[in-house]
């Protein structure tokens, strides 16, 4: 296999047995593809597909005026260029967006002409607000903060059949219901009641009999009965009654008389139940008529009206029950034929017929009025109003839309073959749904499972943005309709008609404050990726936490390969917020698909198909680990498969598909846990969630035991710098990399140089530090896609969230009781878990009523010492070390004139005015913070003079830009002259540049000329002269282009900043805070094994092995058995082997062994023991040495989930590293030097420091703010609150009998207002007595009792 630039430097030993059939897809595709589809940015006007913005415009336009004399049509749209790039937007606190310009056409028709002749056409581009752009990493910058739009998992539109699980009626009878859910519009529900009548609800309002809806659709009673029932035909001749026999219908009935065949042979005796055998005999005998007694008809329902043959009088309406009186009437009138409905109790119930009987309406108008009354109670119905309302409910494309998905699901569910159709409902649709519902009630067909992923679909960013945009457009449409009537008379242009505000507001509201637009979790690269791949069932149009039951939250068989069964939050959102599985993607309808390999007749091919949950149900799917031979045939007699959402076994020839990878079941975070297969699911859940909270450490350290997914996460997260084009590194320093692009990758007209500016010490959303470090050195060759610089938490292009620690599982003096962690001081000394946090502090100078606030170093009543870190503009220097309470930005605010005392007047008179009319409102460092100022940004509004500091910052930024552009020009120029040199070398000159005619050009000749002189050469060949001219032109153009670029940037920097109204100046100060690990910080492994650091011990006190190597961390062995996360033990053993091998390589390097010996040993490490084979033969000796140098600290291993290292392989690795195969060693107590009595498990585990730091939580209060009503101190660190002394604490003091302590707790220390003020005064005076009064909360209690109407008073003596 080919290794990339970074992979070559450090190869991970891979234990996987299964071949990679398919690479893990790009992890952010779900976000980027969806938004690309929405914008269709690159498409030309004719090639717009009917999705996204284009579809939204087309669904609202054309807008036609009320009179019909003017229309506004949509032609197309184009997106402008963003005003600022992403970094500038973050700095300035603005939205990264592009202007949207829409071309519309106003058509005015001639009123006079009869056939609507066109009188006038005006076309114009209209500005429709800004559309936020997605950054290349799948985020949006909204008001300067990075946000992510989380995808939503909602119920797919379509029709669903369900029952109430017997909960509605006390008898436990199942009541079936059908619900038609459109993409937008009214919901339509059909439901049975306990008496088996069918009712309809629209938008969950009051229910009406379902027949009312059918009548409103124009069906008569007879048509309804014809649609839903078959009929039995009876012939009457005199006193005799005969039935046209359909033998199947008799099944299960009891014979009322003997049934004979034509020969008179009895087939069924009277009183016997008719069985399938009897029916067969009847069919054989060919009995067509059956004589039945007259009472056989009684109780049956007529299917058609019975009409008097002579007079035409209607004897009985259809749907009437046959009674004795009616029979006599019918016989009298000599009616020869009656039809009754065929119903029975088994599979053909009389539900619709019963419903028609309770229906009070008799014609279409009455039904429409009834529906109108239900929808608009209290309004007087008119015929027109009722018709309009009903038609708008389900049959108008403006109000109702099933969408393509909904139509596809609808048609499939009611058994139609075509999947396309209209977005509105038709009569037939509604009748088909009712038919299907009745069939299900009759026992034919089954109800749907709403948690099946075939019935839930994913709405991504693009779709949600489109819906929001459409909402805005519909608001615009109303306004435009009003104005269009004026346009005819007043000759308005399209621009005057369209007000873009509603659209812009709708878009802004969605991106800024929708529940699904979330502040990006930027703790580390993994948390970013996971956040973008999250799928939430909450949000608008989704579920709510309170209403979601257990079924929705549960793992469903269809989650396999689509949604991760492990990664979900603990707490109220469990199961509602999920993560996409590693290989999952959405199809065009928004259903999640998973990839499978095709299997034919037991032979596995490499063809891959993506299937949705519905499509995969009929397939027989083998696991990725199914045993195969070299010819890719399945060799087991029975293969473990999934079929019809069940796990079972089948023969190899029945298998149709096979998983592509064992890790396709889990999400990215879960696939980063080695030995996941040995962990209990609950702990694995905690493990995958806690990796997202790991804080990037000062020096990233790759995990010794990984899973091989680390590289994918680091590459796709966008925190690393990836080469856009291949080439040679021209220059590199800490903050930028310049690449001279290889010739074959340079398109014509492009510059042959790429400049990558690295992100240095920038604040992330979680206040952690984003910093990139170059990995390449000058002269290195890189390919497209190679990683050139590491970001936070990445090490040589691999994700590195924590540190490899030498750990021992042993109890140690109770310091690791209850999951506590005991650390060695060495961990702190080596800065293993030191993290850098960056805080942004903002100072805003506003224009107040009394005058402008001023940022200045001249602050009243502040000593020199406090100002020594400020410059003359009153802003702190970069690099200053500041502590709590230090001034960062000096600011004074004018204060109102107060009445002056005579003394003050005297002072005023002596010292002038300034001294006292301003107050100090400087920005100070908050309590408990100590750090270094690393950056200062100054923003000044237009028209306000910029201070010296702002100008200095601007000059520095311009120098940076100029340096970049000069560098680019230097390389472009260099490359051009190189190309010219190779073209001119050996050619003959025709004169010019001081050279004689006929001179042959050599390198020396060219070196003797200045570059400017080269263009004066006249060559003998015309082609060369042309090339020289072209080169000269190219260089001039390039210079001009770069100068324009510089001017553009300069203009942007020098224009005033767009600040909020009333704000004159904003100063942002960035503080870098270094946090070492300390007791109280939370740490965790990757297996859900979390704990709090309890003590940091000196190195000499830690347990050590026979060689004297101390351990770094001591963990409690009791944390393992009950939690069943054995993966951590296996990781510890394999980590020990990895480290041991590294030390062995280190010894070989120290002894300066030959490269050949190293090659042999490395081959043994990589290829002898299980797993993937690495081809080291293609490495040069230098590359082998470089590789060995990077392996000194440990050979990194990959043990992919469900396909990882086996126990015997771990033992073999330990043996190869000359370590005990048990993974246990004898340890000695560091304090006494005595041996511990049992060998202890020692090894290397990857530990993370989580973003729950004691510094952020530690808090103490002296006096502070109080709650308004109860007068008790507030709670929480943010409010500078106190500690709650709750009821259990009160009991504790009561149990001790500490009466006075209890009294002061409940009074002067809490809410006795007078007592606490007095106490404060007393303490100041040195008098420590207290006089407790009445606690305020007691007064509140009295008031509350009074509010119940009980007069309560305290009797005070």
Swiss-Prot record:
**Which domain of life does this protein belong to?**
Bacteria
A single GO molecular-function term is: DNA-directed RNA polymerase activity
Reaction it catalyzes: RNA(n) + a ribonucleoside 5'-triphosphate = RNA(n+1) + diphosphate
Question: What Enzyme Commission number(s) appear in the record?
Answer: 2.7.7.6
Q: Among the entry's GO cellular component annotations, what is one? A: DNA-directed RNA polymerase complex
One GO term under biological process is: DNA-templated transcription
Q: Does the keyword Transcription apply?
A: yes
Q: Identify the InterPro entries for this entry.
A: DNA-dir_RNA_pol_bsu_ext_1_sf, DNA-dir_RNA_pol_bsu_external_1, DNA-dir_RNA_pol_su2, DNA-dir_RNAP_su2_dom, DNA-dir_RNAP_su2_hyb_sf, RNA_pol_bsu_bac, RNA_pol_bsu_CS, RNA_pol_bsu_protrusion
Q: Which UniProt keywords apply?
A: DNA-directed RNA polymerase, Nucleotidyltransferase, Transcription, Transferase
Write out the similarity annotation: Belongs to the RNA polymerase beta chain family.
Q: What does this protein do?
A: DNA-dependent RNA polymerase catalyzes the transcription of DNA into RNA using the four ribonucleoside triphosphates as substrates.
Subunit info? Answer: The RNAP catalytic core consists of 2 alpha, 1 beta, 1 beta' and 1 omega subunit. When a sigma factor is associated with the core the holoenzyme is formed, which can initiate transcription.
Name of the protein this chain belongs to: DNA-directed RNA polymerase subunit beta
Kindly list the organism's lineage: Bacteria, Pseudomonadati, Pseudomonadota, Gammaproteobacteria, Pseudomonadales
* Gene name linked to the record: rpoB
